[in-house]
Amino acid sequence: MMQYFSRNNAVAVEPISLVSLARLATPLINEVFKLSKRHGVRGLKKWEASSFPRKIATRIKSLDTVRTIWKSQPLSLQSFFHPPKLNFQGKPEFVTRLSAFEDNSVIIEGIVGQGKSIFLRSLAINEITSNDAQRLPIFIELKDLTSKTDLQGAIFRTLESYDIEIDEETIDFLFRSGKFSLLLDGFDEIEEKIVKATYLHIE
């Protein structure tokens, strides 16, 4: 468990273009697709299409557009967000990549409005915009869960939007491959009546 600590004074960068994002995502997409073929997994066959990286890029790019209390129009988070420090067992460290977390399961704590959601979005974007993307981020907003759409359903729906066909073999491959990161945002926004069930799903 880590606490959201503070932000540094780094200069914000210009939003990355969809074309550049697709280009940067391509090596990881190709790697995962080839790995799935070697394991005989058929659920990612649509990833072979030359247009697929752009589709993934569009999904990731959507995480970059956010609304703030300062502007009436949506902004690119890259235009204003500064990487934070997280408190790793009493030691504050700057974090910009998912690879900074040694554990596979991490909980980030912070007060309301401190920027945890924006931080998770930035981690997803930075993973792809780095020159050595290791994992494809799967971003889930827990506030959208209902008694009819549980966490598993939300995950499956997001995977389907990535042109992944849902079957037991494919799901097993995805979460054993080490090439996907599940980012769950908004624990404090889960409907009270489904909190327990959601926590059990996570465990």
Identify the residue ranges that each predicted region occupies.
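P-loop NTPase signaling cores
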Residues: 4-10, 15-48, 52-71, 75-203
